[in-house]
């Protein structure tokens, strides 16, 4: 995935993480409340949502672009794994990226993902790119506290 850098290092309204909740709300407005998601990932360009269907054996990808939910992509069959609901999404969009940006000031935050875990819990992952080309996935708590770092 190619991400765009941003001069805006604040979170909240000026950051792409602020698009996640409206994107989920748009899917729920389109399909009904209580949808289950395999993953939601936002970057500077779009927010991608993978909605679980057919008893979580398939996923329907949606793109939220410029404040609008786009028509769904074709269903992806053979999906499996954990899912989560909108109620499980509890990150603080004002602070969730700040610890990573403070620890890696020269790196670009390329994406923020919400991934499903066992029991409907979620895992938040910040994907970064260093000026030297190294990539890290940084798992964070809802407030941005760094929990784990995985080099890619």
Spans of model-derived segments:
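Bacterial signal peptide processing site
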Residues: 4-8
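Low-complexity, compositionally biased segments
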Residues: 10, 93-95, 120
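A cross-kingdom feature marking solvent-exposed beta-strand/loop segments within repeated
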Residues: 10-39, 109-111, 146-148, 152
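Alpha-helix initiation/capping motif
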Residues: 16-19, 92, 141
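Exposed beta-strand-loop-beta-strand "reactive/processing" segments of non-cytosolic proteins
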Residues: 26-61, 114-140
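A short, surface-exposed beta-strand/turn
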Residues: 58-77, 134-152
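Long, charged/polar, surface-exposed segments that mediate recognition or autoinhibition
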Residues: 66-111
